[in-house]
Amino acid sequence: MEWKLERTAPRRVRTEEEMLWESIMRVLSKDLKQKRSQDSANVLDSVNATYSDFKSNFAKRLSAEVPVASSPITTRWQQSQTRALSSDSFGEEQSTTYLPEASGSVLKTPPEKETLTLGSRKEQLKTPSKGISETSNSALHFCKAPHAMDRDWKESVASKGQKCLKQLFVTQNVVQQANGKMQLCEQSECVWKGCKDGVRDESFHLKSSGDINDSILQPEVKIHITGLRNDYYLNILDWSFQNLVAIALGSAVYIWNGENHNGIENIDLSLTCNYISSVSWIKEGTCLAVGTSEGEVQLWDVVTKKRLRNMLGHLSVVGALSWNHFILSSGSRLGRVYHHDVRVAQHHVGTLRHKQAVCALKWSPDGRLLSSGCSDGLLTIWPHDPGASAQGQPLKVITQSTAVKAMDWCPWQSGVLAIGGGMKDGRLHILDINAGKSIQTPSTNSQICSLIWLPKTKEIATGQGTPKNDVTVWTCPTVSRSGGFFGHRGRVLHLSLSPDQTRVFSAAADGTASVWNCY
């Protein structure tokens, strides 16, 4: 039997479009073969190239491979694996952070500029051969070359970066860097824009607020500052028991003598961070803690002008610092609170967790309680337990309607805490933590950006935001207005009390700072 195969389907006829594409592909294939043959010939000719041509081409190739800078959070995350190898570091998980106090605040973690100066974040305690010392008594003169993800790029910039790796410590009366500037007001001869615009009419302000009987506080000295970040969530002003004022302007900390009103020196960290986000003096010495936008917590001795150590672990902006003897607590915008024992090499001794950004940290005067304020409106009271784990339970959690940033413990009455409400609240809250209730809640009709207690006169001073932009003094225990200072045109972001408790340093978003008598 014979089998015969027959075509059942009709013969397919190619269309003009298919024929056109086949023609195009043939041309492309031919061009590709010619290109490959030419490249092979060029490779053979390159054997005769000079060394200068090879060096020039190699340099051009390196310059084209510059890594793109990212935000501080991303940069720290990329280096988490490297920093885990350091004996002076620990990890922090990332979380989504929402900052509701949006009016006029710098709420985003990325810096003001589109680029970020990249610096090495890895620093080991036992690497003296690399020029870094991390002990409590040794000086740290150099930091590592700027870090980059590409190995070739790191090697190409290392030689240039070695000339500018020193942390700058400048000593002069008027300190000026690219980051900022502090200068005493020259009164009638002053050409500062804020002074040329004229002085605010305090009497009109008092009449409009109904407080004509209040006393008007006069400034002892007025200072012009540039580089102050208009960020509601930072804590960049502190006055030490040695009568030294520290204020962060950009990526530098300026040390100012509170007695003779002269600038002493500054600490410039522009090589390692975008800006400084918090400062805090230790109570028992001249050590200054500095938190940065890159998540570092550095300790500086302003007498010896040496950096004592650099404590890593945070992956985001460190916006709050608070001392309890030798325990330093730091809070970040990723909601982590770390306890550091600065006396030991393994400094990380405890962790507390929040769901949102930490805006404020304050240890009570007796050191038994820690209060933390968050951007989600939660005021949390923690027990004294530096070794707390991530599952540490708070003593109390009090819900507020706005972010809890302005906060301070009463120095003469145990368990009393004052917090300032944000723009949507506008109230000063005096809380009895032991009873878990509010004692007084007077309305300020404005955002409260900062506050401090005045023990000499048993009063509270609050730094107001929009629309008042002044400093209001409240008498306790009635919490009624008794006076104010009206020398600022921008919201008063920071307040700090002198060691003798008779003067207040105020810094505002309009680029002015004042020292005024409160006693």
Swiss-Prot record:
Residues in WD repeats: 229-266, 271-310, 311-341, 353-392, 399-441, 443-484, 487-519
Annotated GO biological process: anaphase-promoting complex-dependent catabolic process; de novo centriole assembly; positive regulation of anaphase-promoting complex-dependent catabolic process
Keyword presence, Repeat: yes
Alphabetic keyword roster: Cytoplasm, Repeat, WD repeat
Primary residence: cytoplasm
Entries under SMART domains matching the protein: WD40 (SM00320)
Region (Disordered): 79-133
Biased composition range(s): Basic and acidic residues: 110-125
Short name of any one Pfam family annotated for the protein: WD40_CDC20-Fz
Compositionally biased intervals (Polar residues): 79-98
A GO cellular-component term linked to this record: cytoplasm
Compartment(s): Cytoplasm
InterPro entries according to UniProt: Cdc20/Fizzy, WD40/YVTN_repeat-like_dom_sf, WD40_CDC20-Fz, WD40_repeat_CS, WD40_repeat_dom_sf, WD40_rpt
Annotated signal peptide: none
Single GO molecular function: ubiquitin ligase activator activity
Tissues with expression: Expressed in multiciliated cells (MCCs).
Sequence similarity: Belongs to the WD repeat CDC20/Fizzy family.
Function: Protein regulator of centriole-deuterosome disengagement and subsequently participates in the ciliogenesis in multiciliated cells (MCCs).
Protein name per the record: Cell division cycle protein 20 homolog B
GN (gene name): CDC20B
